[in-house]
From Swiss-Prot:
Organism listed in the record: Mus musculus (Mouse)
GO molecular function terms listed in the Swiss-Prot or TrEMBL record: histone deacetylase binding; protein kinase binding; protein-containing complex binding; transcription corepressor activity
Name of the featured protein: Corepressor interacting with RBPJ 1
Location in the cell: Nucleus speckle; Cytoplasm, Cytoskeleton, Microtubule organizing center, Centrosome
Cellular component terms per the entry's GO annotation: centrosome; cytoplasm; nuclear speck; nucleus; protein-containing complex
Record region (Interaction with RP9): 204-232
Amino acid sequence: MGKSFANFMCKKDFHPASKSNIKKVWMAEQKISYDKKKQEELMQQYLKEQESYDNRLLMGDERVKNGLNFMYEAPPGVKKENKEKEETEGETEYKFEWQKGAPREKYAKDDMNIRDQPFGIQVRNVRCIKCHKWGHVNTDRECPLFGLSGINASSVPTDGSGPSMHPSELIAEMRNSGFALKRNVLGRNLTANDPSQDYVASDCEEDPEVEFLKSLTTKQKQKLLRKLDRLEKKKKKKKSDKKKKKLQKSKNKHKKRKNKSPSSSSSSSSSSSSSSSSSSSSSSSSETSDSSSESDNKEKKREKEKRKKKKKTKCSESKSSDCKEDKPKNMLYEELSSSHSDRGKAQEKLRFPKQESSGENSMWVHSASDRTSRSHRHSPEKKGSDRNRGIRSRSRSRAESSRRSRSRSPYRQKHREVRSRPHRSPSEEQKGRKGTRSHGEGDHRREHVR
């Protein structure tokens, strides 16, 4: 019941946690490390050969110069065999005594760092600093020099073959073996170039500035603080003035660019407005109004003066346009009235002999009819004048309203100006002519009836 899924899967051959797979991986790793060591040995051998070859060249050996050195040297395999024989003849050093006659595998023969467990006893791959023996540390009770300092350990009688217990020698041996003490333990025995050995000023020595400040009174300190505050304020003011100057320069450049554009547009608009249309004048006024909102007070005053002048010119133009529009109408009315009067005179000449034969009563009737006809003849002229007056009054009222609207909204100027213009189609003019003719013909018919 207590077995888990991992325990079940580790027994499978394909699972990486199985014992067979772990063993295979470990064996492969050991073989790779063995091959690497072989390659390193070959490289070291090659480097030694090169060094010897270079030394011989420096010494001036003729064999090396002629390239015949290979004939007088033994092959590399012979040297290895000789070394192995020497090692077997001499006593090899082992970490532990039980390793002397113990059998080992090929991959573990030359490697002394591999941990072994003979007879199930755990072997520690550790070396003591004091007695230089493997299997324990200087803090273990197994060490014969346990509980003794370096000086006392050096005074203990030991064999001549044993290592010395002097602390400097111990530190050197530790470094050679790959160990090192902490800096806190070493203390002052370090070199003079070490940064921890630099000269540090004591607390008693104080800076001259601090001493000067301590010697001052409270009033003098307050004065110093005030001076420092003033200097800081001056620096801040200088910075703010520089920023303001930069902003003013940028604004002036921007204004100059904008003033150039509306001046050119206003000149073009004035030339076009004097020629034909009032729409160009409205566009120039809108441009000036936009530029005045962004410019300063001085520019606003100048633009106001320009506006007044333009308004005067516009009023004169509108009046002249109204007069021009009214002139052709008046001419038409005068022509119509003159034509009607000529016709009436011709008809009267034909009727005079008939009227003389008739009595005095008919004379009185003709005189009355002449008065009525004259009144009717003069009536269209009066009507035309009345119409012209009404049109002029309307155009003036609309012009005033358009001026007010321009000051308020420049975008509706065009629409209102188009409305203010009194346009009449040719059909309407023909109707007006027919109406005047019908009035004249009606008068003549009445005369004939009478």
